[in-house]
Amino acid sequence: MNQPSLDKLMEKVDSKYTLVVLAAKRARALVEKQAPLVSVAKSAKPVSIALHEIVDGKVSYRQAKGGIK
């Protein structure tokens, strides 16, 4: 995983765990046919698209008392 860099991704979230959960949930939504929020190559995989969306600020999260919502 070279693009986007982990350093840039970590600027958008508070922990690596949050990053993994956020990317996984967004990738799952992409697999279920939601449209990508960024322009990427057609050969890009859902997790790669999700990471690009996170670093571009297109996907965000809010910390709930009981976990990520």
Swiss-Prot record:
GO terms for cellular component: DNA-directed RNA polymerase complex. Pfam families: RNA_pol_Rpb6. GO terms for molecular function: DNA binding; DNA-directed RNA polymerase activity. It is an enzyme of class 2 (transferase). It catalyses: RNA(n) + a ribonucleoside 5'-triphosphate = RNA(n+1) + diphosphate. SUPFAM superfamilies: RPB6/omega subunit-like (SSF63562). Gene3D superfamilies: 3.90.940.10. The keyword Zinc does not apply. Its EC number is 2.7.7.6. GO terms for biological process: DNA-templated transcription. Disulfide bonds: none annotated. The keyword Calcium does not apply. Keywords: DNA-directed RNA polymerase, Nucleotidyltransferase, Transcription, Transferase. Promotes RNA polymerase assembly. Latches the N- and C-terminal regions of the beta' subunit thereby facilitating its interaction with the beta and alpha subunits. The RNAP catalytic core consists of 2 alpha, 1 beta, 1 beta' and 1 omega subunit. When a sigma factor is associated with the core the holoenzyme is formed, which can initiate transcription. HAMAP family: RNApol_bact_RpoZ. Belongs to the RNA polymerase subunit omega family. NCBIfam families: rpoZ (TIGR00690). This is DNA-directed RNA polymerase subunit omega. It comes from Heliobacterium modesticaldum (strain ATCC 51547 / Ice1).
